[in-house]
């Protein structure tokens, strides 16, 4: 629709004044550059989770919260995102507020620990200041904060053990996120906050679980992932890993409430080969054919039982890469097979 020439001239002058005062790109027409509407992502290292997210990974320029019970795989998922970013030539930082990062495990997951920036801050304020500085540099692609529960305000650290500091951490997070959100959007960084789970006292109905740090992170996060261990994986009598379910509780860049399941193997992290087998057999027609206990790819019989098929793919990375490429070529991310989780009323309260 053509605007009145006088009105168009007034708008152009206003846009020019805004750009002169605040910089180029501070205001634009939404459809001016279609490329801006495409969501840039960093893969998670799990094909199944990339599918559930709907866009192929975690969106750049956005905040992601990963939460769940202890030892459910939260840090493992975050470390895989770091590894994927580094493979793409990106720079990653890990703000270790829990002082619990294991460099040997990180390296086993594919993280280049020689080039990983690590900080172990003393206070919550220090951790969030470091995060802001890294984001504003514009040179860091992924920043992981582990964890929100460990971001202890300076006043609490300097106070006595029995002192009460109600709402102090929530106010700290709220203030920090107000400052961070604009900088994150401009820098195109993926900022991941790992969080724990607490239980609200006296809840009779609904979900009693909540996450520490107040409500601000829930609002500012574009993606929220709930990570839970569903079963233990065994090889004979030996425990070798766990089956993990990740539910996309909130998603501002694609439809939410999808879920992904994958194997986390001890000492190896997310089994990419296992995810390929899961998705490859679910496609119609399947990329990987399951006949009885045997798995086949084309004319190749890749193993009897999932464990053997997974080991075979690990030993033949060129075939695994070919299968992954076929899956990506066959279907767009949005149309890949995903399982929808039940939309429970209690999810909004976590």
Swiss-Prot record:
Any coiled-coil regions, as ranges: none
GO molecular function: ATP binding; ATP hydrolysis activity; ATP-dependent DNA damage sensor activity; damaged DNA binding; single-stranded DNA binding
Localization (cell): Cytoplasm
Gene3D superfamilies documented for this protein: P-loop containing nucleotide triphosphate hydrolases
Gene Ontology annotations of biological process type: DNA recombination; DNA repair; SOS response
The UniProt record lists the keyword DNA damage: yes
Segment forming the signal sequence: none
SUPFAM superfamilies: P-loop containing nucleoside triphosphate hydrolases, RecA protein, C-terminal domain
PANTHER family per UniProt: MITOCHONDRIAL DNA REPAIR PROTEIN RECA HOMOLOG-RELATED, RECA
Protein name, as recorded: Protein RecA
Originating species: Symbiobacterium thermophilum (strain DSM 24528 / JCM 14929 / IAM 14863 / T)
Lineage of source species: Bacteria, Bacillati, Bacillota, Clostridia, Eubacteriales
Gene transcribed to yield this protein: recA
């Amino acid at each position: 629709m053509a605007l009145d020439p006088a009105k168009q001239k007034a708008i152009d002058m206003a846009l020019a004044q805004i750009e002169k005062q605040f910089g180029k790109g501070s205001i634009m027409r939404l459809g001016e550059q279609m490329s801006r509407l495409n969501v840039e992502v960093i893969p998670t290292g799990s094909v199944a989770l990339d599918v559930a997210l709907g866009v192929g990974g975690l969106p750049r320029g956005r905040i992601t919260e990963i939460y769940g019970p202890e030892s459910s795989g939260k840090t493992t998922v975050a470390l895989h995102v770091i590894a994927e970013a580094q493979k793409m030539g990106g720079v990653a930082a890990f703000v270790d507020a829990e002082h619990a990062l294991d460099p040997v495990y990180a390296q086993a997951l594919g993280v280049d620990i020689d080039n990983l920036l690590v900080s172990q801050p003393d206070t919550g304020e220090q951790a969030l200041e470091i995060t802001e500085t890294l984001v504003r540099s514009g040179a860091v692609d992924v920043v992981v904060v582990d964890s929100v529960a460990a971001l202890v305000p300076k006043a609490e650290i300097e106070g006595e053990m029995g002192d009460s500091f109600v709402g102090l951490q929530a106010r700290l997070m709220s203030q920090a996120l107000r400052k961070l959100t604009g900088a994150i959007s401009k820098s195109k960084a993926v900022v991941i906050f790992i969080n724990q789970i607490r239980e609200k006292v006296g809840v009779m109905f609904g979900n009693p679980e909540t996450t520490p740090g107040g409500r601000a992170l829930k609002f500012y996060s574009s993606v929220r992932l709930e990570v839970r261990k569903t079963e233990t994986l065994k090889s004979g009598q030996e425990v070798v890993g766990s089956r993990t379910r990740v539910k996309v509780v909130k998603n501002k860049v694609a439809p939410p409430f999808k879920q992904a399941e994958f194997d986390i193997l001890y000492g190896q992290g997310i089994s990419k080969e296992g995810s390929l087998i899961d998705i490859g057999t679910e496609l119609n027609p399947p990329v990987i054919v399951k006949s009885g206990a045997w798995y086949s790819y084309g004319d190749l019989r890749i193993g009897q039982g999932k464990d053997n098929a997974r080991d075979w793919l690990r030993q033949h990375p060129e075939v695994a890469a070919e299968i992954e490429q076929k899956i990506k070529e066959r279907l767009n991310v949005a149309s890949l097979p995903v399982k929808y989780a039940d939309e429970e009323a209690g999810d909004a309260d976590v």
